[in-house]
Design a protein with these regions (language model features):
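Extended recognition/assembly regions associated with phosphoester-bond processing machinery
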Residues: 1-53, 57-230
Length: 230
């Protein structure tokens, strides 16, 4: 039975605690933000299954009490209404997980390794695009990446702390083997905004993008089109 399924990845639970071990202190907002977003998703879409697509936890080491409690709490929250499938990411040492799952004709795997099966949905990459402003500055948008010809879909991280690898400004930053093996410059980019998903064109087209701010709003200007953001 393949009922409605939600796929999220790269939660990196325990992120703040891991940084504290190195003397860096951040507001403890990661788990709370993830819980709020999950509650919204569960009530809006009523999925029968939720796939956690790897890097559920942050620390590579065995989970401590705090990280374990956060992971257990998120899984328990989802389990109240849906089946939970945990796919193993490269951070997910010492937790129960599967290497992949096949759903509706798609291979779902974290993405730090490539099984070679297509079409595939992966995380791991933390994709984003940074669009420079005309007078400096700019903005960074988390995004989905769809390399349709190669059958590769990359989802953005679910953690609010994961700002993402900038595919526009540093095309050498690509980590996921499946994405590296594709012609990702021609992949379609879908930005995640407060208004929903926004088609930003291909990655190749974004190399020439400019952002201009006017008192009537902010828009992304391409060579051949304008997409309103605000």
């Amino acid at each position: 039975d393949e009922g409605p399924t939600v796929v999220i990845g790269d939660l990196h639970l325990g992120y703040e605690h891991a940084l504290e071990q190195d003397g860096l202190y951040l507001p403890r907002i990661n788990t709370g933000s993830i819980r709020d977003a999950l509650n919204d998703i569960m009530s809006r879409y009523e999925p029968e299954r939720v796939v956690l697509l790897g890097d559920v936890k942050h620390d590579f080491r065995r989970a401590g009490r705090e990280e374990s409690n956060q992971v257990r709490g998120i899984i328990d929250l989802i389990s109240e209404d849906a089946q939970v499938v945990v796919v193993r990411g490269n951070h997910d040492n010492y937790i129960m997980a599967v290497s992949h799952i096949d759903i509706m004709g798609y291979r779902l795997e974290h993405g730090h390794e490539d099984s070679g099966v297509r079409p595939v949905i992966i995380g791991h990459e933390h994709p984003s695009v940074r669009i420079p402003g005309a007078v400096g500055g700019g903005m960074k948008i988390q995004c989905f990446v769809h390399a349709e010809k190669e059958g590769v879909i990359v989802i953005p991280p679910f953690s609010p702390f994961s700002s993402g690898n900038d595919l526009v400004m540093d095309d050498d930053c690509v980590m996921a083997p499946a994405l590296k093996a594709s012609d990702y410059a021609d992949a379609r980019i879908y930005g995640v905004t407060d208004m929903g998903l926004m088609d930003l064109g291909t990655l190749r087209s974004l190399f020439d993008v400019k952002v201009r701010r006017y008192n009537i709003g902010l828009y992304i200007q391409y060579t051949d089109s304008v997409h309103w953001l605000l």
